Amino acid sequence: MTPTGLGYIPMVVEQSGRGERAYDIYSRLLRERLIFLVGPVNDATANLVVAQLLFLESENPDKDISFYINSPGGSVYAGMAIFDTMQFVKPDVSTLCTGLAASMGAFLLAAGKKGKRFSLPNSRIMIHQPSGGAQGQASDIQIQAKEILDLRERLNRILAENTGQSMERIAIDTERDTFMSAEDALSYGLVDKVLARREDV
């Protein structure tokens, strides 16, 4: 279950009484219930994350899943597939920003279980409204415009619920790109704690 588009992926060799077994690093970490969203949110990455969430739920429905995010965002539809699955599965999904959680990446970061949403100290978080392009006849453009406005309303409502901010504040802050430090994201309610070391968890 390797994230796509990462080039060379290191292998880990484990030895046991039954011999050796090689895993790519992400498959090995999946055994520890760690999932990664690295790079853009698209159908391919969303399908991988959804499959891994469902797999880990089937393995143990009572043990937390850790979801590491380093993503500039991407497709709203693909991101909503991940979001809905995070809410659907029984285990708590803990989120951690490593590097950048922008756009849909920030939305998914905030969607983790309350009290279990983290950021590393030098990570950056960015929220904004969904964007899209439309072409074709005027009626087609009108349909697309309505869809993007509906998506913006839905995303803002969920973000308000997850952060404790008002809908009005979310609407203002997502009007343009709003970048935040890890501490800013903590104050805003996107994360619950900034972690400098593992023992801080």
UniProtKB/Swiss-Prot annotation:
One Gene Ontology cellular component annotation held by this UniProt entry: endopeptidase Clp complex
Keyword Hydrolase appears in the UniProt entry: yes
Active site (catalytic residues): S103 (nucleophile), H128
Keywords: Cytoplasm, Hydrolase, Protease, Serine protease
Gene source species: Bordetella avium (strain 197N)
Function, as annotated: Cleaves peptides in various proteins in a process that requires ATP hydrolysis. Has a chymotrypsin-like activity. Plays a major role in the degradation of misfolded proteins.
Positions of transmembrane segments: none
Record Pfam families: CLP_protease
GO biological-process terms attached to the record: protein quality control for misfolded or incompletely synthesized proteins
SUPFAM superfamilies assigned: ClpP/crotonase
Assigned EC number: 3.4.21.92
Subunit structure, as described in the record: Fourteen ClpP subunits assemble into 2 heptameric rings which stack back to back to give a disk-like structure with a central cavity, resembling the structure of eukaryotic proteasomes.
Subcellular location, record wording: Cytoplasm
PROSITE patterns recorded: CLP_PROTEASE_HIS (PS00382)
Family according to the record: Belongs to the peptidase S14 family.
Main location class: cytoplasm
Signal peptide region: none
Catalytic activity: Hydrolysis of proteins to small peptides in the presence of ATP and magnesium. alpha-casein is the usual test substrate. In the absence of ATP, only oligopeptides shorter than five residues are hydrolyzed (such as succinyl-Leu-Tyr-|-NHMec, and Leu-Tyr-Leu-|-Tyr-Trp, in which cleavage of the -Tyr-|-Leu- and -Tyr-|-Trp bonds also occurs)
HAMAP family linked: ClpP (MF_00444)
Highest taxon above the source species: Bacteria
Keyword set includes Transcription regulation: no
One MF annotation (Gene Ontology) recorded for this entry: serine-type endopeptidase activity
Protein name: ATP-dependent Clp protease proteolytic subunit
